[in-house]
Swiss-Prot record:
Positions in coiled-coil regions: none
Chief location of this protein within or outside the cell: secreted
Protein origin, superkingdom: Eukaryota
Pfam family of the protein (one): Cerato-platanin
Induction: Expression is up-regulated in presence of human keratinocytes.
Signal peptide range in chain numbering: none
Key words of the record: Allergen, Secreted
Organism from which the protein derives: Arthroderma benhamiae (strain ATCC MYA-4681 / CBS 112371) (Trichophyton mentagrophytes)
Upper lineage: Eukaryota, Fungi, Dikarya, Ascomycota, Pezizomycotina
Family: Belongs to the cerato-platanin family.
Gene3D superfamilies: RlpA-like domain
Name of protein: Allergen Asp f 15 homolog
GO cellular component terms, semicolon-separated: extracellular region
Length: 205
């Protein structure tokens, strides 16, 4: 071992092998060799291993809350079912209601474009109204048919979507059929719904 004069600078061990470390020190840049401690060897090996086999990144999980009981796509190709509220609006009871007054008026997907002009011209009037499936003007879901059930009586009707609404907002006559003439008394109810065929609402196949 070589002796050094003067005070030592802080030394940094550099392991050349599991048992020998070099220590840089002194003014004349001499090199002092000393055995590595067992801890130094273990730490050195552990650090090298961590660079060779890094731990995989943690995966993040996201939770999407359900809204209105719907865990479904509203695309026309997807099957839709769930639970929403249903109310009524007497304007849909008017057979002379012009379809220019509803969301599903004209446009490529509009009901006027398909040959209908008034609420009464629709094949299953008065079982018509607004539905959550209609996102806005020219929606692909204009004219979409739903089977709507009131669990209290286990009674169902088929409803044609002609307007935009939260849940379903149908003709009073339609709600009376569903509730055994209790629409005026109940005002709003919870219903279940599912996709139905266009023919269920009277449209041609």
């Amino acid at each position: 071992m070589k002796a050094f004069a003067g005070s030592f600078q802080p030394w940094i061990p550099q392991c050349r092998s599991p048992c020998i470390c070099e220590v840089a020190a002194s003014k004349d840049n001499g090199v002092l060799e000393r055995p590595c401690s067992t801890l130094s060897v273990i730490v050195n090996i552990a650090v090298k291993k961590s660079y060779i086999n890094p731990s995989p990144p943690a995966k993040m999980k996201f939770t999407i809350p359900a809204t209105l009981g719907l865990m479904v796509s509203l695309s026309s190709a997807a099957a839709i079912s769930g639970t929403v509220s249903l109310s009524y609006d007497p304007k849909y009871d008017n057979a002379g209601l012009s379809l220019t007054q509803v969301t599903c008026s004209d446009g490529t997907n509009g009901l006027i474009t398909k040959g209908f002009t008034t609420a009464g011209s629709l094949p299953n009037f008065p079982n018509i109204g607004g539905s959550f499936a209609v996102e806005g003007y020219n929606s692909a879901n204009c004219g979409k048919c739903f089977k709507v059930t009131w669990p209290v009586l286990n009674k169902s009707i088929f409803v044609t979507s002609i307007d935009k609404a939260d849940g379903f907002n149908v003709a009073k006559a339609a709600m009376d059929t569903l509730t055994n003439n209790q629409a005026g008394q109940l005002g709003r109810i919870d219903v279940t719904f599912e996709d139905a065929l266009p023919t269920d609402c009277g449209f041609k196949a």
